[in-house]
């Protein structure tokens, strides 16, 4: 049996990256306890790991950008262009297919259909009633959500809302609490309840247009729940209950009692970057693209998607792939000019006195040079045999 210190020395001498060394070391310690390895066996395992690592490396000169673009772009031509229902939750619409891929790579701050998947903690995840409690805390409830009927009484200058008793009970609110919340928020109006009827009277307003504006504000007023979140759906997945939300407020949902913050996620990548940081946003980009592809039955090697995510998050902020992001910020003047707005790029570069080092593919194609890709990356000079000079 080899000593742990010897294993560590052998592993750390290898050319593997630190994270792989760490993993290999832990595995070898585990196998050493189980099989009592000899030093030669440990060395053979390390050698195999190094060989596999070398095989996994990209060949020098491989045009990985072009390969990644082709590998993601070609399957995406077969994707659907519609918004579909979300993973079996018929009540919640979410953008899938090509529009979702475009949304991700364009790094849009507001996705067209933001959705959160809220996992619950040990106490709440197995009990439907407890899951409903958490959903009530999250679900955004407005007067409009609770109303069965709304009307403006022009003669008496009142806005009347007929509250649906079932919806009211489901929301966990009552008429008294609604009156209290509205009275605290709208100082310019008086509120009165008659059974399940809510009557709103403006204190000073004399114009009908002002009454309509007040009615709109009262309708949209949030009584409870998180801002930005609409309805919630509870689904049973395996043994546990999971909450899906229409709309997203990632920062606040993690603070809600009963929520498991380690597993809860949103499809809004900017929110993830703000709350959890750029590495989490990178992982979210990868996961969102992979899941969108898989929903359509398309398999793409994850390394291409990882390359896209790495480029988008390289500077510590999310950047789109396009004229306002990565392509528009290329160091090569000719590459920027070839992409779009040619004259503007050339004039601005001339004004600044920029020099193009001709390191990329586009700029070399433009001026008719061999591109620095594959064998073009190698610079060879030949030493030809010289004939001895005649006397």
Curated annotation (Swiss-Prot):
Origin: domain of life: Archaea
CDD domains: RNAP_A (cd06528)
Broad class of where this protein is predominantly found: cytoplasm
Keyword RNA-binding among UniProt keywords: no
Single Gene Ontology BP annotation: DNA-templated transcription
Keyword annotations: Cytoplasm, DNA-binding, DNA-directed RNA polymerase, Nucleotidyltransferase, Transcription, Transferase
EC numbers: 2.7.7.6
Reactions listed under catalytic activity: RNA(n) + a ribonucleoside 5'-triphosphate = RNA(n+1) + diphosphate
InterPro entries found in the cross-reference section: DNA-dir_RpoC_beta_prime, RNA_pol_Rpb1_5, RPO1C
GO cellular component annotations of the record: cytoplasm; DNA-directed RNA polymerase complex
UniProt KW Transcription keyword: yes
Molecular-function annotations in GO: DNA binding; DNA-directed RNA polymerase activity
Location in the cell: Cytoplasm
Similarity annotation: Belongs to the RNA polymerase beta' chain family.
Role played: DNA-dependent RNA polymerase (RNAP) catalyzes the transcription of DNA into RNA using the four ribonucleoside triphosphates as substrates. Forms part of the jaw domain.
Complex formation: Part of the RNA polymerase complex.
Protein name according to UniProt: DNA-directed RNA polymerase subunit Rpo1C
Source organism (scientific name): Thermococcus gammatolerans (strain DSM 15229 / JCM 11827 / EJ3)
